[in-house]
Amino acid sequence: MPKGRKPKGPVEKKVIHPYSRKAAYLARDAIKQERKEKLKGEKAQRLNLVGEKLLWFQNQLNPDKPEYTRQDACEITERYLQRFDGELEQIELANSIKGRQGRQHSSREAIIKQTIERERAQYEGNGFEIPDIINAKHLKIFREWNGDLKKLPCIKMRKLSAKGSDSKPSTVSQDTHMEEENEEDKSLDSDSDL
């Protein structure tokens, strides 16, 4: 008995019914892949921002200085927070030229101002994350870093705050705290008199 011929061309895919279980499975799989790609892109963008920040800090380091104090780290951080000042001046200069209609570069200006505001709030609040340049061992590792984003986990970070920049608490804050306690005691005494 002769055997039937096998098709030599590509096999046609069966058409999937749109309401079938297989169609639902493929749709879920596609959504899952899109979500993975989106998260991957967001993570890459975050890593790029951190990498740019670390490269900026690395360029600001003095190669002759073996160790940095907390005050030095605060000064470098202040310079980092003022890194857009020149660009903002250029935008203001372009906008001040007479005869121009509208504000040029307004979206870039808004992004810069939001970034500065957010970073300043972090620095004055809970703390702004910088590479740990105060510790000599971590500083050495940071100086040897070549900008590779895959080696970011090797670099230790430290939160630095403007209010925590002094090593000892100021006496002014203690005096104001004592005055507040005295005012509370006086208000409690006046309430009890009623």
From Swiss-Prot:
Q: Which GO terms describe its molecular function?
A: preribosome binding
Q: Where is this region: Disordered?
A: 160-194
Q: Name one GO biological process term.
A: ribosomal large subunit biogenesis
Per the record, the domain of life is Eukaryota
Record's keyword annotation contains Nucleus:
yes
Task: State where the protein is found.
Answer: Nucleus
Per UniProt, the keywords (alphabetical) are: Nucleus, Ribosome biogenesis
Q: Which Pfam families match?
A: Tma16
User: Per the record, what is one GO cellular component?
Assistant: nucleus
Q: State where composition is biased (Basic and acidic residues).
A: 185-194
Q: InterPro entries from the xrefs?
A: Tma16, Tma16_sf
Q: Please verify whether the record's keywords include Nucleus.
A: yes
The task this protein performs is described as:
Involved in the biogenesis of the 60S ribosomal subunit in the nucleus.
Regarding protein family, the annotation reads: Belongs to the TMA16 family.
Please describe the quaternary structure of this protein.
Associates with pre-60S ribosomal particles.
What protein am I looking at? Answer: Translation machinery-associated protein 16
Q: Which organism is it from?
A: Danio rerio (Zebrafish)
In the UniProt record, what gene is named as encoding this protein?
A: tma16
